[in-house]
Structure formats: C-alpha cells, structure tokens
Amino acid sequence: MARRSRGRFIDGILLLDKDTGMSSNFALQRVKRFFNANKAGHTGALDPLATGMLPICLGEATKFSQHLLDADKRYLVTAKLGQRTDTSDSDGEIVQTREVNFTQEQLDTALEHFRGETMQVPSMYSALKHKGQPLYKYAREGIEVPREARPINVFELNFISLEGDELTLDIHCSKGTYIRTITDDLGEMLGCGAHVIMLRRTQVAGYPYDKMVSLKQLEELVTKADAESLSLSEVLDPLLLPMDTAVSGFKEINVSDELATYLMNGNPVQVANLPVDELVRITIGDARQFVGIGQMNDDGQLAPKRLIVLREQQD
C-alpha cells in the first residue's frame, strides 16, 4: 500500500465563514484538504446551526490556537419568542409554548441582568465533557448531569430589533459563554420562553469581519487553480493571516540573532524589560521574525514556552 501524502508544510490562519448545517470539524477537514495542509485545527467549535467566523490554524499556527479559544467573541443572535425547546435552539423539540406579552421596559430590565460578570450553568447540549463524554451525548439519552455554574463576562449586550416574535441581539462576551443559555434564560425572565433560530459569530479577538472566506469561495479558487495550472500557494496562501496574529495582544520581546540561537534550542536567555507572570511574543533580529511565545522563569530569564519550526513553506 502506498504511503499517504502528509500534505504541505503551510503555516497561517484562515478566517473561515462557516455555513449553517455543518459541524466545525467537517469545515476544518474541508479547509485542510483544500490547502493540502499537513496539520490543521480550529479554535473553538460553532454549533451546526451557527454561521460565521471560525479561525482555522494551519501548520505551526496550531501551537497558538488555545489563545484564540480563550479570546473574546461577538455574536449576532435572533431568538424566537414564545417557544422553548429542549436544546434552546431550532434543532431541538418544542417543549413549551407561551404567549409573548412584555413591554420594552421589561425587556430592557431583563437584558441588563445579563450584562457584566455573571455565573452561567452550561447547557446539557454542549461539548463540555463529563467522565470523558460530551454533555450532549448524555442529553440525547435523557440523562441530566449536574453542572457547576461558571463565571462569564458579557461586555456588551445590544438590542438590535424586535419584529413580531423575533428578537435580535448583538452580544460581545468572554470565552465559554453559551448564547443559547442566555437566550433560554432571557425567555424565562420575560415569561414567554425563547430559543435561538439564527446565530452568527461576527468576531473572534480582533480579527476583521471582512477577511472571512467561505468554503464555496475556497472551492472556486481551487477549481481556478486546476483550470489555469496554478499552484495552491498562488491562489490560496494569500488568504492566510500570519500565525502571530493569534498572540498579537502579547507584549513583544525582540531577541538578538545571537541570543536566538540559544533560545531556539530551548534555553532561557537574559533580556531587558521582561514582564512578570505574562506570556510574551518573541521576535528575533532586525526583521522581527516571530518565533513563538515565552515567559519569565524563576531566575528572571526569558524561557521559551512554544516555539515554531523555522522552515521555508513549500507546496
């Protein structure tokens, strides 16, 4: 049997605009195939119902995907009022129907309850694990698992529109915030019930909305490459953002070429202006080439935490 090709060594981050009706892993595997990448990973799953920004890390960028998983997110959500479902979204079964009857003042008061730092009990229909199994698997078997409330922060919760029984909100929140849970809880506070019928992630960290690319656009570019005998690097690679954008919020520490030799071999080095208890973004030389992240050790030196493999990208 022939050895399967391991793919290209390609490093960077693609801002995928995920379509509705597909899992995040399905979208990830499609992107990996389009780029013929040897390694790929996403930065926090979107429900099949949801659309929008799903950063896909390729190659060495996967080493920093956790920092995007931990980043703030922004969503546009439309809730259908008057109906509660077992999954808190339109993929579930309706379990309760009630009349929608509240004032704008009551809505404003209810929305204020969710702003700022609060505690949230995760939905049973989530990917959080209990004894190695995702909660949603227990939920599908009718098993309720005790969950502890977790701290979340809703930085902004903006009212967009109320058209008939459909309420649209813009939510900027911390990692681990379940929009379906906010929607369900809001519906209960309003006394009518609610569930998500549209959910779109519009931002992850500071990534620009207009840089997103859909699977359809990628497919069209691959078709163009085949038709015009172009390489993948010519048509797809320009869509990738530099891998250090995943840690752009970290302080930069620039290391000389001489010290970089020690650092890249895993050794700590002495540098000036190193912050205490903070991860930093490491660059080397006058070109300020990104090589990874590090942190001060007990001796006050810069110790590498995650370093990339320096190589020329190739088809």
Swiss-Prot record:
GO terms for molecular function: RNA binding; tRNA pseudouridine(55) synthase activity. Keywords: Isomerase, tRNA processing. It catalyses: uridine(55) in tRNA = pseudouridine(55) in tRNA. It is an enzyme of class 5 (isomerase). Pfam families: TruB-C_2, TruB_C_2, TruB_N. Disulfide bonds: none annotated. This is tRNA pseudouridine synthase B. It comes from Shewanella halifaxensis (strain HAW-EB4).
